[in-house]
Amino acid sequence: VVLLDNGRLKMLKDPQFREALTCLKCGTCLNVCPVFRELSGLIWGYVYVGGIGAIWTSFIHGFEKAAPLAFTCLLCGRCKSVCPMEIDIPVMVLKLRKMLIEAGYIPPPIESIAKNVEVYGNPYGAREKIE
């Protein structure tokens, strides 16, 4: 018998994310996810897709791999409203985002906006005044 932990013990010890262990991976959350509907899961990881996939990815492969997934979630809460285990996925994704930002990760689109404001005085990168 081979037992594969896949980050479960680490997740069990973390009260912020322990709830993710109750995920049945039934896909009910994906059926109502607007991001999944538009992107068909193509960019939502390979551990598992959706917001809960961002949490699992962070524990199995590290926060760096989970970063794009965490910032793709809209935090709309539709997943929570249909989850048979009543997992509060948006709250966990928000906690993951906070941890990523505290570790210095800034999503590329937000970093781009910040640079544009600094260099051009506007978020669009327009060189001339927009009226």
Question: What is the predicted role of each segment?
Answer:
Residues 3-25, 53-75:
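Ferredoxin-like iron-sulfur electron-transfer modules
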Residues 7, 27, 41, 45, ...:
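Residue-identity detector for glycine
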